[in-house]
Every structure is written in structure tokens, then in C-alpha cells.
Amino acid sequence: MNPSPNTQHPTPSSLPYREGRGGSFIFETRMEVRDYECDIEGIVNNANYLHYIEHTRHLFLRSLGASFADMHQKGVDAVVARMNLQYKIPLRCDDEFISRLALRKEGIRYIFHQDLYRASDEQLCFRAKVELVCLVNGRLAESSEYDEIFKKYIEE
């Protein structure tokens, strides 16, 4: 998914910490709803919210100097194991929204709490809990590489 032209990519350290459901948000980016993402009712089709939060995770990783493609070349793939989604207030065509992310680790799972807020009034539109696990050379395993990348955010 391509970001809209006005998408901003702050570094995690430049983001003021803000409490979210899953802890402090450590990353945010802005995006805009495009007309083709909406259904006949004029609201964002439910599947597009998954694109928004996935794109946010990719931008977050890139802001830390890594990428899913680079990790794949090393034989390490972070894959979604489970999602819990809550649709709150629909986004509509041309709405600008803020995607915020918090992260913690439980066992071998990386837990991302991701919220989408309508920029005009900070109304919560969508909330997700996304659990990722790593496949190292095709097998479920701990990833020392991802632990290193995320260490600032997952150390207790």
C-alpha cells in the first residue's frame, strides 16, 4: 500500500509518548483515505483498515533502520498469528487520520496495539491488537534479530 503524499514518518524517539490501550504509543503516522478504499456506503471498506495498520508497522520498522524485506533475506519472517479488531467510527473519503502504535513482547509473540484516530477531532475509529510471531528459516522460533531491533521498547 502506498502512503498518501502527505504521510509523515516521525522517528519513534521524536514522538511524544501518549497512553494507549496497550501502553504508551511509540510511533505514529498520518494517512488519508482515498476514494477507491470506500464502499458503496461511502465509508472505508473494513479490509482497508488492515492495510493501514500493516503499513504503519512497516513504517515503524523502517524508522528503526530495518525492513521486512531485509529480514526475509536473512531467513527471519515476522508473521501475523492473531488479530483482534474493533471498528468504532467509520472513516470516509478524504478523511485524514492518525495511526498510532504501541509494542510489547509476551513470550515469543510481539504484541502491537494499534489505534486509528480521525485527525479532525481525534475520534477513535479503529482499534487492533496484532500478535506477530517469527519464522526463522521456516520454523517458529525466537528472533534475536527482532529482539535487537525492538529492544528499546520490549525491555522491562
Describe the predicted segments one by one.
Residues 23, 74, 121:
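Short, glycine- and charge-enriched coil/turn segments that flank and shape catalytic ligand pockets
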Residues 37, 84, 131:
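Short aromatic/hydrophobic contact patches that present stacked aromatics
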Residues 46, 69, 142:
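Short, electropositive, low-hydrophobicity segments enriched in small/polar residues
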Residues 60-110, 127:
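Hydrophobic beta-strand-centered segment that forms part of the acyl-chain substrate-binding groove
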